[in-house]
Amino acid sequence: RGILYHSIGVNGAMYVNYTDEAYIRQLALLKPSLLIISMGTNETFGRRFNTDEFSGQIEAFLALVKKELPNTAILLTTPPECYRRVRSGKQRTYVRNDNTERAARAIRNVAKKEEVACWDLFTTTGGKNSCRKWHSSRLMGRDRIHFTKEGYQEQGTLLFRAFMESYNNR
């Protein structure tokens, strides 16, 4: 008994990349008790991010997961706020990626609709304008999108606390 941890991740992955029956059938071979899905950031960098389309991609993914893993608990996480790089003349600068807030809201809504758990990392890390604090605290990397090692450790601590709080309140 105990915890068997398995991580699957690909740089730049999006929900649409994992919405594949063959992939989900392979995932089912692991017989997970809990599946934690932490995606959504990459979708927010598209030129025409659309929350309805994004929600549909999550719903399609969840439909496959529920079909192939009917006894597996599912936890969706929302993306934390991040920056995006923009050009201003010859200069490159960073601005808040407003789409992460929209993606977080969409994930929360889909989780409620699909009756799966959701951990709101966007709000937990401070919500709107939190990327400034995470970056100045050196918890966000140079790209201003991904966390540093310390940032990911903090994310893990926050998730652990949320699990324990939920467990203690059952």
Predicted segment positions?
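A short helix->loop->beta-strand "cap" motif at the edges of active sites that frequently abuts
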Residues: 69-73
